[in-house]
Amino acid sequence: MADKGSGGSRLPLALPPASQGCSSGSSGSSAGGSGNPRLPRNLQGLLQMAITAGSEEPDPPPEPMSEERRQWLQEAMSAAFRGQREEVEQMKNCLRVLSQATPPTAGEAELATDQQEREGALELLADLCENMDNAADFCQLSGMHLLVGRYLEAGAAGLRWRAAQLIGTCSQNVAAIQEQVLGLGALRKLLRLLDRDSCDTVRVKALFAISCLVREQEAGLLQFLRLDGFSVLMRAMQQQVQKLKVKSAFLLQNLLVGHPEHKGTLCSMGMVQQLVALVRTEHSPFHEHVLGALCSLVTDFPQGVRECREPELGLEELLRHRCQLLQQHEEYQEELEFCEKLLQTCFSSPTDDSMDR
């Protein structure tokens, strides 16, 4: 329902504090030597500032705003602020539902209704928090503490996966929220869900949240390494859940591309051998991401190339056979390109004696 990210037509939650001034970019010096103009304290003042700022263009001279236009603009801005207040109230109502204790003497029907209400609250919050302003407000309302402390470990799988999804939704591309979530110890709990939960949906949503906390987030990646996250990721790739396998392989590939400094760690874990073993399983679209990860692991990394050349792996023969299989299938073009790149990188030269010299 809400626009994603900070873009769209939503107005900012609050004006900047007076100490920051109100200029933005290179055009903010038009006030001359009189200092920064006073910031408006209400909607009427904001409207007046917008009109004044618009009239500073020297050429052509601005036309006076008609009363009809002025009224329309004021109503539109009022509606925007009112909509934001309403969404904050919705989030507060959801948090009231989620904060309630489960009735200790409730019967089966009452417990089912209670769970449905909590699931509905989590779903509405996930919808609202697609907007970055709402996600920030949710965290200011201590919503993240409630999710991490209570709902990631809830007894009902429907609550666990919705909590993981909401954590990921709030954390996407917002460093301040990522840092708060990491500080609450969420990554350890999410990795445990990915590795051990009995519900496939919980595991998929946990992986989504993990991805939002470690991609482009150095502190998150360091925690991921300390918690042996790559081993958890490899085990997820070995499961029978196709969506989980694909998303795990894609995250591994992304981390290898973005953080090549960890290739040595992965090789020491036997990652090359495990990836090749996955390629040997019955063919599926998942193999494209496995081969992509393997390509990333050997690119500009002689240790990875040497391990791929180990005769007992039989990788060269496997890749040549796979190329023959894929050549007539346009839908597997990217996988074919990965196979050809691996052949070129690992098996185009006759020996590896000079690789590190």
Curated annotation (Swiss-Prot):
Protein name: Hsp70-binding protein 1
Stretches the record annotates as Disordered: 1-69
The UniProt record lists the keyword ATP-binding: no
Any one cellular-component term (Gene Ontology): extracellular space
Any one GO molecular-function label of the UniProt entry: ubiquitin protein ligase binding
InterPro entries (UniProt xref): ARM-like (IPR011989), ARM-type_fold (IPR016024), Hsp70_NEF-Inhibitors (IPR050693), Nucleotide_exch_fac_Fes1 (IPR013918)
Residue spans of the ARM repeats: 130-172, 175-215, 218-257, 260-299
Subunit structure: Interacts with the ATP-binding domain of HSPA1A. Detected in a ternary complex containing STUB1, HSPA1A and HSPBP1. Interacts with PGLYRP1; this interaction blocks the cytotoxic activity of the PGLYRP1-HSPA1A complex.
Sorted UniProt keywords: Phosphoprotein, Repeat
PANTHER family: HSP70-BINDING PROTEIN 1, PROTEIN FOLDING REGULATOR
GO BP terms in the entry: positive regulation of proteasomal ubiquitin-dependent protein catabolic process; positive regulation of protein ubiquitination
Sites of Phosphoserine modification: 349, 354
Tissue: Ubiquitous.
Biased composition range(s): Low complexity: 19-29
Summary of the function given for this chain in its UniProt record: Inhibits HSPA1A chaperone activity by changing the conformation of the ATP-binding domain of HSPA1A and interfering with ATP binding. Interferes with ubiquitination mediated by STUB1 and inhibits chaperone-assisted degradation of target proteins.
Top-rank taxon: Eukaryota
UniProt key word Phosphoprotein: yes
